[in-house]
Each structure stands twice: as structure tokens, then as C-alpha cells.
Amino acid sequence: MTLNEAEIGREYIVSDIETDGDEDMKSFLFSLGCYSGETITVVDKKRNLVVAIKDARYNIDPELADAIKI
């Protein structure tokens, strides 16, 4: 399941990051602290997703959310 399919307010564990070889996207997600085994929570869903990773919140687009498997 991808992060786009996640329920708002529920905590998930990242199982994988699948970027189809896009190293820039993978590096960006890692810089946010988003990697396999990390907890992530969807705070809001509108056009983009607001997610909480560790003690920070980030606004990510649907393409990034599709790369995050939970």
C-alpha cells in the first residue's frame, strides 16, 4: 500500500521507498527522515499530503507519496 492510500491520523511504518531509479527523489525522501522502518503519519490530505516524520511536518506531492510504501 502507498502513502496515498493511508488514513488521516493513523501511524504507519515505512516498509520501502520505490522511486524507479530516481536517486534525487530517494535522496530527498531520506533527507526528510523517510526511510524503511521509520514511522510516518498522514496529518492532512487535500491536493498534497501533510505528513509527520519524527518531530517535523512536511507537505509532499502525490508522486512522492506513491513512492512511499507502508
Give the ranges of each region predicted by the language model.
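Compact, glycine-rich, soluble single-domain proteins
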Residues: 1-70
